């Protein structure tokens, strides 16, 4: 039963998104709300996993030799000066690989590319609509962001990202993902309930005794990373991106959250860090 004071937020009429979904119906075009308007509901999609990696493998550059270029997928090519055919997309970034190679870098760190909703911020400043530009508010951890794809058709975002990673590796460039496991896009008690909250709010988030959300992340909620179920979810996610997308490494946003127990206290030996 629904009981906010006990941290129970599931409602029988609320459609929930599978946290393990490999693809999500989302923003086909950046800044445009799909059919459903403000009441749009995220749905999982079935995807094919038939990308041919040929002989692509992990480059294993020595850590001390890495020259890392941190970038935002959309921001890197969105301006016309980038000269690409598909600006602001995975494909647009692939077009710029010769430029990256000329710089002499041997790794790129992609700022968040997991599914997020740039339309969640409804504020207006000086007459301009604000967007969740950076992507640090994850909707689905196993799914590439749909608005970063250049072709509007189902399942293309995964193959387009894999093609980018394949071409980067062919040019000696490793791929590191910026991952955000400290909080999610569901926010605090005033935020939406579309996934973890409805599945088991008490397990996935750190809650106060009266059912409110601890906010050590500064983003409304905190993932309960050292609970066995959440810990398994995180490790499953990282393993998925390594196996299926051949990702070389990860940068953990606000990694100190990974060291906290369910009440927010720092742990001497956090299980999630030991697992990683």
Question: Residue ranges of each PLM-predicted region?
Answer:
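The feature marks proteins involved in alpha-glucan
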Residues: 1-70, 77-85
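Substrate-binding/active-site clefts of carbohydrate-active enzymes
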Residues: 72-92, 98-246, 254-272, 276
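Conserved, function-defining core regions and hallmark residues within catalytic/recognition domains
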Residues: 251
